[in-house]
C-alpha cells in the first residue's frame, strides 16, 4: 500500500472527501494534494482550503480553481449543440461535469509529480466510472485510489465515527438526519436518497432549491430572446454574455418561472435503476431554444441524422466516455452541422413551460415563405410534380402488395 508517494484528491471539503483525505494519509502514508473545482455549485469553495489546512495539507498542495467558464464553454455548450438527452429526459448535468474534473486532476498530478489520483465516488454509482475512464484516457499509467471500494466505512454512521475519532470538523452534520445526497454545478442540481428511494413517493416541496413550483411561479408570462452563433448562445435579450453568464442568467429566469424540474428513474451504467430528482432550469430553456433555431437552419436529412445519433452521443456522456475517440468523432460531425445555426429565438416562459413564439436567421434560414405558403406561390412549387414523387415512393409497397395477392 505504501508505493504511492503523492496523490491528487478531488476534494469538496465535505464529510466524505475529508474522511478520504485523512484515510489516504493513514493508509498510504503518502503526501496528499487537494483539488477543489468551482463549477458553479453555489457554495463557497474557500472553506475547503481551511479544512485541508486543518488536516495537515501544505498550502502549496491546495488547488482551488474557478472552472465555470471552461465548464460551460468546452463541455456544456458542445453537449447542447447535440441536443443530448439521456433516456428521453435527463439533461446530463452530473455526467458532463466529471470529464472536466478528471482533466484538471490529471493536469495537477502532472504538475506536482503525483503518480496517483483519488475520488470520493461510491462503488454503486456511475461517477466512479466517469472519473476513472477520464483518468486513464488522459494518463494511462496513473494509479487510481477509490476508497469506497477499499475501506470498510460503508455507512454514514461509520464515516461520522471515523471523523470524530480523527478530529475532522463535522459541524454541518450534527443538526439531525442526513440531507439528500446532492450534486450541483452551473447546469443543474440533483437530489437522491432518503424518501426518494421510494419511487412512489412525491418529493417534498422544500427539497427543491433552485426553482419555484409552477403553482407559485409568476402569473404573468415573460418573453426572452436568445441570439445564436454557430449553435451557441451569445446574447440574452440583446446583451452579449460569456457562456457561464448565459447559463447563470437562464437559470435565474427558468427558476423564477418554475422551469426545469425532473423526477425520473434512470438506468445506471453499473446495472441498477436509480431514482433521482433534478433541477435544470437554464438547460431546459437552452434545449428548447436550440431545437427551434435548428428547425430553420438545418437541412432535413442533417437534422434527422443528428436525431438518430443523439441517443448514442448522450449515452457516451452518461457512461463516462467523453474522452473516447467515438465521442470526439461524433462531436466533429455535430460541430460541422452547427456552422449555419445562427440567428435568434424568442421564447415565452410561463409556469413551468418554455414556449417558442418566434425564430429567425437572416443569413442561414432554409425556410422559404414563397414555397411554403398556402396561397398562390407564383409557380415556385409545381403541384403536379408530387404525383410522380408519390408513385416512385409507393413502388416498393405496390410490388409487395402484388406479391401478397399472388400468394393468395
Curated annotation (Swiss-Prot):
L-citrulline binds at residues 90, 95, 126, 130, 181, 190, 266, 278. GO terms for biological process: argininosuccinate metabolic process; L-arginine biosynthetic process; urea cycle. It comes from the Bacteria. GO terms for molecular function: argininosuccinate synthase activity; ATP binding. The keyword Nucleotide-binding applies. The keyword Repeat does not apply. Signal peptide: none annotated. Its EC number is 6.3.4.5. It is an enzyme of class 6 (ligase). Gene3D superfamilies: Argininosuccinate synthetase, chain A, domain 2 (3.90.1260.10), HUPs (3.40.50.620), Single helix bin (1.20.5.470). Its main location: cytoplasm. This is Argininosuccinate synthase. Belongs to the argininosuccinate synthase family. Type 1 subfamily.
Amino acid at each position: 500500500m505504501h508505493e504511492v508517494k503523492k496523490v491528487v484528491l478531488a476534494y469538496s471539503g465535505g464529510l466524505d472527501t475529508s474522511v478520504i483525505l485523512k484515510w489516504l494519509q493513514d493508509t498510504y502514508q503518502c503526501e496528499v494534494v487537494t483539488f477543489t473545482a468551482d463549477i458553479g455549485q453555489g457554495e463557497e469553495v474557500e472553506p475547503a482550503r481551511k479544512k485541508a489546512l486543518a488536516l495537515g495539507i501544505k498550502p502549496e498542495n491546495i488547488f482551488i480553481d474557478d472552472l465555470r467558464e471552461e465548464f460551460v464553454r468546452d463541455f456544456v455548450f458542445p453537449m447542447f449543440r447535440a441536443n443530448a438527452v439521456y433516456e428521453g429526459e435527463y439533461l446530463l448535468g452530473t455526467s458532463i461535469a466529471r470529464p472536466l474534473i478528471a482533466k484538471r486532476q490529471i493536469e495537477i498530478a502532472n504538475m506536482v509529480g503525483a503518480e496517483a489520483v483519488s475520488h470520493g465516488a461510491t462503488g454503486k454509482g456511475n461517477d466512479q466510472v466517469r472519473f476513472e475512464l477520464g483518468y486513464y484516457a488522459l494518463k494511462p499509467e496513473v494509479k487510481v485510489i477509490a476508497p469506497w471500494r477499499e475501506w470498510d466505512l460503508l455507512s454514514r454512521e461509520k464515516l461520522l465515527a471515523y471523523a470524530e475519532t480523527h478530529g475532522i470538523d463535522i459541524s454541518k452534520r450534527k443538526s439531525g438526519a442526513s440531507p439528500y445526497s446532492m450534486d450541483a454545478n452551473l447546469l443543474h442540481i440533483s437530489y437522491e436518497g432518503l424518501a426518494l428511494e421510494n419511487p412512489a413517493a412525491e418529493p417534498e416541496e422544500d427539497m427543491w432549491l433552485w426553482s419555484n413550483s409552477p403553482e407559485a411561479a409568476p402569473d404573468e408570462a415573460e418573453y426572452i430572446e436568445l441570439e445564436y452563433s454557430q449553435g451557441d448562445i451569445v446574447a440574452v435579450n440583446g446583451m452579449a454574455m460569456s457562456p457561464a453568464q448565459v447559463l447563470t442568467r437562464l437559470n435565474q429566469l427558468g427558476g423564477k418561472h418554475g422551469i426545469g424540474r425532473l423526477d425520473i428513474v434512470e438506468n445506471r451504467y453499473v446495472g441498477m435503476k436509480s431514482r433521482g430528482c433534478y433541477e435544470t432550469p437554464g438547460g431546459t430553456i437552452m434545449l428548447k431554444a436550440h431545437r427551434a433555431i435548428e428547425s430553420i437552419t438545418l437541412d432535413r436529412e442533417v437534422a434527422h441524422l443528428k436525431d438518430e445519433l443523439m441517443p448514442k452521443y448522450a449515452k457516451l456522456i452518461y457512461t463516462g466516455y467523453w474522452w473516447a475517440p467515438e465521442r470526439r468523432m461524433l462531436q466533429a460531425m455535430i460541430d460541422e452541422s452547427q456552422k449555419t445555426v445562427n440567428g435568434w429565438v424568442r421564447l415565452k416562459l410561463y409556469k413551468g413551460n418554455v414556449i417558442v413564439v418566434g425564430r429567425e436567421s437572416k443569413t442561414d434560414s432554409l425556410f422559404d415563405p414563397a414555397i411554403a405558403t398556402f396561397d398562390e406561390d407564383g409557380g415556385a412549387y409545381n403541384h403536379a410534380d408530387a404525383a410522380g414523387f408519390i408513385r416512385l415512393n409507393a413502388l416498393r409497397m405496390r410490388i409487395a402488395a402484388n406479391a401478397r395477392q399472388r400468394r393468395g
